[in-house]
Amino acid sequence: MRRESSTVVALAGPVRAELLAGLSRSPNISVVGGGAPAESANGQPSGEQDWEPGARAMREAARRRSTYVVVADDPLAGVAAAWRAMWDLNTGAQGAAGFEDQAAQALAAWRGKQFELPDYYLLVPEPAGSAGADLHLGPLRAARPRRVALATIAPADREGAGLLASLRSLEHGPWWPPLDDLLDAARTFFAGGLTETQSYPT
């Protein structure tokens, strides 16, 4: 369990650069992550695992002393993408295998104390028509409803006002269960039961 004085909030979803820039200008808010993927010495992608950018950002967030530290990289990003793909009927058995691979990598890193989960996940709305099965709105929110929130962001918002208001509305709740319990819950969670979407309002 995290014990730092700052509240660490990880953003999930398509985060526009101007929203992060707007947040970074707000008093008592630090923004971490959201940069380009890491490259190797020859300028090619480094081949790092999907949890690593989020883990680095979470470690950096732990060193900040702002009231809120907003993290634009999620250590569970690979798990979330694989969970969504698993519900795509076109992927077949490969979808489930991909999820298990990502889950094993993230769980090993978490057990190795490479990262901890943020205090909260704040979901950035996706463009209408592109939303699908979502790990955060599904099994994670079912496990800890007050640890996952859907941001209210208008498409015309360029300064992060919606994100800022969403940060201030977060409610305290029980801490996360162990990551292996969350992953087990994801294996049995029925994505078709989701009643809330994460699309922009029309």
Indicate residue ranges for each PLM-predicted region.
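Short, well-ordered beta-strand core segments
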Residues: 69, 120-123
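Extreme N-terminal, non-catalytic leader segments
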Residues: 1-8
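NTP-dependent small-molecule kinase module
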Residues: 2, 15-16, 127-202
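Short glycine-/polar-rich loops that comprise or flank the Walker A/P-loop
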Residues: 115-120, 145-148
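Short catalytic/ligand-binding loop motif for oxyanion handling, primarily in non-cytosolic enzymes
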Residues: 18-19, 77-81, 130
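Hydrophobic anchor at the beta1->P-loop junction of P-loop NTPases
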Residues: 11
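Glycine-rich phosphate-binding loop used to anchor ATP phosphates in small-molecule kinases
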Residues: 46-116
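Conserved substrate/cofactor phosphate-moiety recognition/catalytic segment
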Residues: 14, 20-66
